[in-house]
Design a protein with these regions (language model features):
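Gram-negative bacterial Sec-dependent N-terminal signal peptides
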Residues: 2-17
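Gram-negative and organellar
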Residues: 19-22, 29-44, 48-51, 58-470
């Protein structure tokens, strides 16, 4: 009788047992570090446990789940997604796989992969709080709040404290806000180095959205008045618009803002129409049309108006990078037309561990050529180009209020004459009592505007929007 194999197995058993103990010890140490709010140390323990070869499937699953949770805490969302995918592969039953899928959906939502997150949790989120929270986050980003209402009604509210309770409350308020009729008021003011003042006041009412088959629709009306004052004369622009938001299936969205306008005895049609096709999280196409008066006193006096047509794309070569090119054609009723384009490259902000801050970056460029350049009526050189690089900072004051800042510098060239340019902006977004919303923007830029541009030019602006559900 050959006794070599049983003897070999007996010799190997202590080594296997020792390795199992090491993996279990690493997992326990990682869980203890998480409970003690030490995610960096926890990640090291869970990574060490996962690196052990030949570990049991349940240990591999536990280590991967812990590694994903640690990475989420530290803001390393791509690493968290990889860890939760590993946990999915090691899951031993449907409940374990759903827990891994919920963690993966949280990591995907944090990277703005909303469609993938929604598809992941929608099959099982009904009646479960954690996956419902991630489904609501994805639905909010996609504008699919009407689809998510049933999930919210079926979920059991979690305790108010902690991440889950806070997110549930905020997302519930966001859903109710999105599905209710809304009133809106907005105010804007700008002043530039030429003494041109532009004051804007507007109000809007939007009906509650409704769905018919694959069509989701929302309609409303808006009224606006704008005063343009250059210190010598003052002009008023008034308009009334029909507002429309249409969602067709999963991929098509149309936004409308169309209606009549007037300035004194001059009557015209104005507004915007925009179509967007977004088949996935990483690519989309868009097209738009805009018609508006040229916003300077002299241009309004001469009844100058333009039509602008644009096509664009959005591409995500990586989780943190967004590339947005646009081409446009702008036709003025004085016979001038422009061919131009713009490009924005965005680096999604990185969360700074153990703080409420995140830092990202932005590159923006614009170029156009006018076939009939002119001076004195509106900014209209033959050739214009500009490019700026900037830093973006985001600070979460608390879960309900967020501050965003941009500081960019670059250069512009107007008919061969170059000059340095800069842009500084601060925005505040948050919630008001009664589930209202506030958006405040302050900015200063030396880049050319519709009225003027060049060395020494600058423009200061402030915009405020307040919305309330009814």
């Amino acid at each position: 009788m050959n006794t070599r194999w049983p003897l070999l197995a007996l010799l190997l058993m202590p080594a296997v047992h020792a390795q199992t103990n090491v993996v279990a010890d690493d997992i326990r140490a990682g869980r203890a570090a998480l409970a003690d709010s030490r995610p960096a140390q926890a990640r090291e323990w869970f990574a060490a446990a996962l690196a052990q070869s030949g570990s049991a499937r349940e240990d591999r699953y536990a280590a991967a789940i812990g590694l994903g949770q640690s990475a989420l805490w530290l803001g390393d969302y791509p690493a968290a997604a990889r860890a939760f995918r590993t946990a999915r592969e090691a899951a031993g039953d449907a409940g374990a796989q759903q827990a891994a899928d919920t963690g993966l959906a949280q990591a995907l939502n944090a990277q703005d992969y909303s469609r993938a997150a929604y598809a992941l949790v929608a099959p099982y989120a009904q009646g479960q709080t954690k996956p419902t929270v991630e489904l609501l986050r994805a639905a909010q980003s996609l504008g699919w709040q009407d689809r998510a209402a049933g999930y919210l009604d079926a979920a059991t509210p979690p305790p108010a404290q902690g991440y889950l309770g806070t997110q549930y409350r905020l997302l519930k308020d966001d859903l109710r806000f999105a599905l209710a009729p809304q009133v809106e008021g907005d105010f804007g003011y700008s002043h530039d180095s030429d003494g041109l003042d532009t004051l804007h006041v507007g109000a809007a009412y939007r009906f509650a959205p409704f769905r018919r088959g694959d069509w989701s629709q929302r309609w409303g009306v808006a009224a606006n008045t704008t005063r343009v004052d250059d210190g010598r004369q003052m002009r008023h622009l008034d308009d009334l618009s029909l507002l429309g938001q249409l969602s067709i299936g999963d991929n098509h969205n149309i936004d409308l803002d169309l209606g009549p306008g007037r300035s004194g005895g001059w009557h015209y049609w104005q507004g915007t129409a925009h179509w967007n096709w977004q088949p996935g999280d990483s690519f989309g196409l868009s097209a738009g049309a805009e018609r508006a008066p040229v916003p300077t006193d002299i241009a309004i006096e001469h009844h100058l108006i333009y039509n602008l047509y644009s096509v664009g794309a959005n591409v995500r070569p990586d989780a943190r990078w967004y590339v947005l090119p646009t081409y446009y054609r702008q036709n003025f009723n004085d016979g001038n037309h422009r061919d131009g384009g713009s490009l924005r490259v965005l680096l999604s902000p990185y969360d700074i561990a153990d703080t409420r801050m995140a830092i990202g970056g932005e590159f923006s460029a614009r170029i156009f050529h006018s076939n009939q350049p002119s001076h004195g009526v509106y900014f209209n050189p033959a050739n214009y180009r500009t490019a700026q690089f900037g830093l973006v900072g985001v600070y979460s004051i608390n879960p309900e209020w967020k501050l965003r800042a941009l500081a960019a510098v670059g250069r512009q060239v107007i008919d061969g004459a170059g000059a340095s340019v800069y842009t500084i902006g601060v925005s505040l977004n948050g919630r008001l009592p009664g589930n209202g919303r506030l958006e405040l923007q302050l900015g200063r830029s030396s880049a050319a505007s519709a009225s003027n541009g060049g060395s020494g030019y600058w423009n200061n602006s402030v915009n405020l929007v307040v919305r309330y559900p009814l």
